[in-house]
Amino acid sequence: MKYKVVYRIIIVIAFALSGCFNLDSEKIKSDERFYHSAFMDWSMKKKSLAKNYTAIIMADPQPWRLNSGDPNGISNREPWLKINEQVASVIKAQKAAFHIVNGDLTEFGQQRNYDDYKNVYKKFEAPVYEGLGNHDYANNVGHCTIPEAYDFYQDACALSAVLRMLSEIRQYRRQLSYFNADVTESSILLPDENIHEIKGSLSYSWDYGDVHYVQLHNYPSYTVRLKGQSTKVHINKSLDWLKKDLAAADARGKVTIINFHDARAASIDGESFFIRKKNAKDLSVFKSIITAHNVKAIFVGHTHYQSYCRAKNDKVFGNIPVYTAGALFNGDYYLVEVKGKTIRVKAYNGAIGRPLLIKDLGIIGEGTQFFASCSQL
């Protein structure tokens, strides 16, 4: 039998070399890409079984924002690239299992800004999992077109951010363990067009070792309606989805880290979009959800400076600690060391070209210092 198999292989090779078989090189390349992709997906799921690992949580790369100049001006591009390429090299050298970016991937949702972020921060050997912030979609709703793509709909930039995120979610679905996402897609057939309809908060979650990670994007109660030439988007609150997702994670015996963008304490300057008195009902629901489940910590961005807060019974967060990541364009990030269900957080800065430890914030939940309030409500 063995000799028959070998003989058949020799015959196939001979026919191929003689030209009797037309081996399509493009098809071979396509198959190679497919099998490579499938292997990578399997490999990433296997790695997620690890109990001990490090992760890096960061926010606000926001090209081309700096602490001076026009964040939308081309004159800021080269200085932004110089600073962020240095920060990225520092982060890459720390060899984390994965990275999380909690929003403001762009300054105004535009593709050229996203491309610079991608070329700087998505070339690590380990994956990067993204969240959207107010600068990616909320800030440009109704007044940002993409003329270079002949897209003159006023929601064009916000839509492009949503569609990029949807593409990421499709990829994550193949690669992440116990992946869950709050999004549905459908086609509406009309007499003269086909509408792609997207509904949900775009929130997603996954397990890595004993930890369940959740990404809620801008903030948990954010809603918006977007319209393009052949696309309609209904971004809904993530609260109902979050409640079910956390219950499922609890049932699997996981502890949870929640990520989103804006948890800035209440203020009068209009830059705190989630924690506002007018959102009191949603804030109360959010608190009831997170305090009823095994949530270890919340990681956010938005403010552009690193901070930590934990209260005994905050009106929004209960006694769950909140870690604000600072801004990547300033070099800020958190290194998260995971050993089973024990999680240690260290604040770093990479702006000087090496990892500078700003503060070891210790093991989550073991601190004895409490603030009077984190939400300032």
Description of each model-found segment:
Residues 51-54, 94-99, 124-129, 208-213, ...:
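Loop/turn elements at helix/coil->beta-strand transitions in domains of secreted/extracellular proteins
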Residues 27-32, 36-38, 49, 337-377:
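A short C-terminal boundary segment appended to hydrolase-like catalytic domains
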Residues 21-113:
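N-terminal active-site segment of His-dependent metallophosphoesterases
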Residues 34-40, 68, 111-241, 285, ...:
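Extended active-site neighborhood of metal-dependent phosphoesterases/phosphodiesterases
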Residues 57-59, 99-104, 128-134, 257-261, ...:
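Active-site neighborhood of phospho(di)ester-bond hydrolases with catalytic His/Asp-centered motifs
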Residues 68-77, 220-240, 249-297, 318:
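Active-site-proximal segments of metal-dependent phosphoesterases and phosphodiesterases across multiple
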Residues 4-12:
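Sec-dependent signal peptide recognition
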Residues 13-19:
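Hydrophobic h-region of N-terminal signal peptides that target proteins for export
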